[in-house]
């Protein structure tokens, strides 16, 4: 399981919707220490925990140093966010690769090298810049979100995917959308405009709705 910010009851209900047996979950990976990602750590204390960020529990792993978890090869990729040790994860199994990367203000050249021609991408498309600037949020918060230690906008997400997606890529999911400074349709349209040659599935993860993927 990746992060645990929602209530345990909510998470278990969503697992049921996906026909996932919660008893089959044997580890918890944490991306960073913001409360919306770690609030339920105690509720899942029976699981071994892996993180780059400093926690009171679990195993501390290092960016770009792969480790094995059962049949998964997992590589943490350092993210640029206002939380120590924030990361995304690259998962590899039976020749297929999946990237999960949200909560980052930009994507480094090092990460781009790791992200080339993957089978699956789950990438942040957090905000539309104009919508963000037109919100009633304090300017300091807008600046934080827009900064290199904030979140990826739709345009940057599209540019990154245009650089990375290749012939192996079959599914792209846009994630971590702001409800106030973005819309699913806007995120989809902007990113789609950059993926001129991409023929696979492009979908948007809505908040509080189950999104499933995987073509096999």
Model-derived features with residue positions:
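Active-site metal-binding loops of divalent metal-dependent hydrolases
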Residues: 4-6, 33, 79-82, 102-106, ...
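Metallo-beta-lactamase
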Residues: 48-96
């Amino acid at each position: 399981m990746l992060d645990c910010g929602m209530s345990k009851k909510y998470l278990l209900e969503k697992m049921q919707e996906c026909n996932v047996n919660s008893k089959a979950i044997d580890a918890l990976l944490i991306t960073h220490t913001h409360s919306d990602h770690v609030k339920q750590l105690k509720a899942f204390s029976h699981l071994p925990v892996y993180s780059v960020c400093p926690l009171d529990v679990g195993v501390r792993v290092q960016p770009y140093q792969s480790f094995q978890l059962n049949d998964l090869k997992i590589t943490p990729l350092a993210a640029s966010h206002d939380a120590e040790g924030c990361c995304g994860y690259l998962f590899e199994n039976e020749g297929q690769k999946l990237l999960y990367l949200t909560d980052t203000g930009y994507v480094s050249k090092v990460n781009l090298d790791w992200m080339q021609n993957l089978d699956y991408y789950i990438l942040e498309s957090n905000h539309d810049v104009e919508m963000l600037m037109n919100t009633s949020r304090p300017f300091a918060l807008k600046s934080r979100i827009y900064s290199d230690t904030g979140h990826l906008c739709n345009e940057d997400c599209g540019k990154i995917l245009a650089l990375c997606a290749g012939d192996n890529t079959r599914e792209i999911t846009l994630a971590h959308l702001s409800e106030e400074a973005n819309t699913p349709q806007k995120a989809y349209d902007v990113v789609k405009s950059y993926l001129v040659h991409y023929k696979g599935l492009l979908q948007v993860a809505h908040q509080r709705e189950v999104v499933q993927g995987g073509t096999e």
